[in-house]
Amino acid sequence: MAQATQCLKALGHPIRLGILCALKDGECNVQQLETMLGTSQSNISQHLNQMKHRDILVSRREGNQVFYQVRDVRMFELLNLLQTIYCGDDDA
């Protein structure tokens, strides 16, 4: 239950939701996320660290860049469900 609570807390901010949406297509570095989300590098880094701390993201270093990806792809199923419930279904 504690893990579910941490997961839902991580989804409780628009930037973190945006990060998850951006990572649906594969791993990204901070600069890519900054471009996609239109917010500062420091803001994105803060949210990435929170998500890593909650075991939602993993990272790997390549040279001086750090790439992030979702630890468990089932997270996208939850994200899709939330989008269907709260954003409506375009096919309906």
Q: What function would you assign to each model-found segment?
A:
Residues 32, 60, 78-79:
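Short, hydrophobic secondary-structure boundary micro-motifs
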